Amino acid sequence: MLKAIVTNDDGVHSRSLRALAESLASRGWDVVVAAPLGNWSGYSKSIGRFRGNRVYRFESRGVRFFTGDMPPAALVGTAIDIAGFEPDIVVSGINYGPNLGIYDFFSSGTIGGALEAALRGFKSVSISSACREEETDCLPEALSISLAVVETSVETLSSSAGLMVVNIPRSPRGFKVTRPCRRVPRFSGEIGEEGSLLVEKFDHSRLFSSEHDSCDGRLFSMGYIPVSLYKIDNGWIHPLDPSRDGYLKAVEDILNYKIFPSAGKQF
């Protein structure tokens, strides 16, 4: 029986997280959800200050849950180190909203949960979607694609490529293995009353749509599912270059064949 830890930064009550965990369990996986009580978006691989020092355990629909008031990375570590659950893969997602480029790689709590596992030597994948929390129509497609990604990742990831980052747009055209975009978004805002600063979150999807290079954000804006792979070497994180590694092209072909047969090579 394959074993998986499922986490995210949107919280343990996220519909997309529960749909993914329950779907894996229904396929015979032994699943532990290790996700925060509330929203910890933007906390990266932080382990936090542990606003609560309790981790609560319960079981629902064949899935065991570990949750507490701490970020995803801390809960993944808790499930592995304290609960003693050693997974075949750690899946972080399905996140509401994409996580694109180097900036999101170092900011996203969802990617941080996957990175925590990768640093410990476990295969891990972060999955984000264009779907937002209030939307329901795009979740079934994102779930179907995510299940194929998990099944492929547990077979293909290795010590030479232990972390996969995936972003699913609406009505995707197929998978493309690529590298993360390098552009860094700027904060925007204005001076408010009494000198306060009103800061707005920048919609960086516009930033990447003007990229000339086929990095993840650019491909996402074109309707593709960008896939970036990383090697963890003695604690250092190395994004892999698809133009130099034939293995990455093989991963792309396998993913496309599972979901988009016309776009992939048959194996």
Swiss-Prot record:
EC code(s) of this entry: 3.1.3.5
Residues that hold a divalent metal cation according to the record: 9-10, 41, 95
Major location (coarse): cytoplasm
Cellular component GO terms held in the UniProt record: cytoplasm
DNA-binding among keywords: no
Protein keywords: Cytoplasm, Hydrolase, Metal-binding, Nucleotide-binding
Gene behind the chain: surE
GO molecular function: 5'-nucleotidase activity; metal ion binding; nucleotide binding
Keyword Nucleotide-binding (UniProt): yes
Family note: Belongs to the SurE nucleotidase family.
Cofactor(s) this protein cannot do without: a divalent metal cation
First-level EC class: hydrolase
Function of the protein: Nucleotidase that shows phosphatase activity on nucleoside 5'-monophosphates.
PANTHER family per UniProt: 5'-NUCLEOTIDASE SURE, PHOSPHATASE, PUTATIVE (AFU_ORTHOLOGUE AFUA_4G01070)-RELATED
Protein's UniProt name: 5'-nucleotidase SurE
Catalysed transformations (reactions): a ribonucleoside 5'-phosphate + H2O = a ribonucleoside + phosphate
Cofactor note: Binds 1 divalent metal cation per subunit.
Compartment list: Cytoplasm
